[in-house]
A protein has these predicted regions:
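Extended, compositionally biased flexible segments
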Residues: 1-39, 44
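A generic local secondary-structure boundary/capping motif
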Residues: 5-8, 34-42, 48, 56-63, ...
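Structural motif
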Residues: 15-17, 24-25, 32, 47-49, ...
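Short, structured patches in soluble enzyme cores that scaffold and shape functional sites
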Residues: 18-22, 44-48, 52-54, 72-77, ...
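Short helix/loop capping segments that flank catalytic or ligand/cofactor-binding pockets
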Residues: 27-28, 59-61, 81-83
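Alpha-helical secondary-structure segments
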Residues: 65-68
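Catalytic-pocket segment enriched in acidic/His residues
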Residues: 80-173
Length: 173
């Protein structure tokens, strides 16, 4: 959702989504993350996430932000060596396994805070920076998102009900 340069083919397309199981993948501030023993290609993705404050279903973009209670950050960890499925037909819907690479214990550190929506003057102008050890690995701004917060919340609410406390990650720079 935050590419260095948007692919013209992505403009006008609906958001591409995957789901993360919250019970075992989410880990709070100060929690531990264990790199899965089966992965040799482990990486990270800094993302802003919106936290839903009110139940919503079938809402439109114009009203979507009324349902956002606040913002937090997540680190979307991935076992990249499990991204491509062996023997899958290249370009097919079955080529990538987003569940295995994204859903393992501790795969999504979150927080440490939820900042109320009212306390962020312009959520579409937040700098995002991620360092690994002392090396800056990601440097972007939420203004670069292809799909803005309201678009993502509205789109998801048209597929299933969102409840207070649901977390919608917005993609990585």
């Amino acid at each position: 959702n935050l590419p260095p340069e948007p692919d013209p083919h992505d403009i006008g397309m609906p958001p591409w989504l995957f789901i993360r199981t919250a019970r075992n993948t989410m880990v709070g501030h100060g929690g531990s993350v264990t790199i899965p023993a089966y992965s040799k290609q482990f990486d990270w993705e800094l993302e802003v996430a919106v936290v839903i404050g009110r139940e919503c279903k079938d809402i439109d973009v114009a009203h979507a932000m009324e349902y956002v209670a606040g913002y937090t950050i997540i680190n979307d960890l991935s076992a990249r060596d499990f991204m491509k499925r062996p023997h899958a037909i290249p370009g097919s819907a079955m080529e990538y396994d987003w569940i295995s690479q994204k859903n393992f214990d501790g795969a999504c550190p979150i927080g440490p805070w939820i900042v109320p929506s009212a306390d962020i003057a312009d959520p579409l102008n937040l700098d995002l920076k991620l360092w690994v050890n002392d090396t800056l690995m990601q440097d972007s701004n939420t203004g670069n998102m292809i799909f803005k917060y309201a678009e993502l919340v509205a789109f998801l609410s048209q597929r299933f009900t969102l409840y207070p406390g649901d977390v919608v990650a917005t993609g990585t720079p």
